[in-house]
Amino acid sequence: MLAQVPNILSRRTILLGGGYFCLAGNAFAAPAGDLEDFGKLARVFDGDSFVLGSGLKVRLANIFAPEKGQDYHRAAASALAALIEGRKIGLSYTGPKRDRYDRALAQVYTLKPDGTPDQWVQSEMVRLGYGRVRSYVDTAWKIKTLLDEETVARDAGRGLWQSPDFSVRPPDPNPLAQFVDSFQIVEGLIISAAQVRGMTFLNFGSDYKTDFTVSIARRDRRKFEKAGINLEDMEGRRVRVRGWVELYNGPVIWLDHPEAIEFPGGDFS
């Protein structure tokens, strides 16, 4: 069932940590191209999806808000509603226009009275701590901006970052095994890097059969090379990776694009 739009917060402020957090001063990113769809909010599903009055269902590209049953699900939905309620909304597309559920997969903007963009909603949600950044190979526009804002929100303990449900995980295989089939952020030191039959394996322990591993397919190596990341020279590097945790000789995250890996100590060199 669709959640009714909350009325308890104004669209210009979000209740956060017992006080009000002003929305001014965000890192605004102008649309990559023309705004293509417009409308006003009808109802909110959760912190990363809603439906317009026209009936068009919208999924905010590049962020992952708490799901139903998780901590901060209702708070994230309220935050999204507060940002866009009563505002004219414009959608810009930076990758596929529809997801597998036929929702518009869009960068979402609130608009000024003259129709020009006012706020980039993804940026606001991440900055307030109500969305984790999630990039895909075909939707990685302005990811660095969002990742920087996520780091600030996480360090400040805003929103969902107060909950252990969304902690950055260490690469300990036993606890990570509890999060199989879920989106996680993992940070740790790469112990070794190896190529086997064209696959690249970044190992976070001494036993590849049980330890956490990041895997990159042969067909995706070129993307990392073009981004200046030498996968063969990763031993001893501290990295932060994000993606879906699976089991394959221990917990594994498969990466198919370089935007899903960060270097907390600085850019790769």
Model-derived segments and their meaning:
Residues 2-9, 14-269:
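Small beta-barrel nucleic-acid-binding modules, primarily SNase/OB-fold domains
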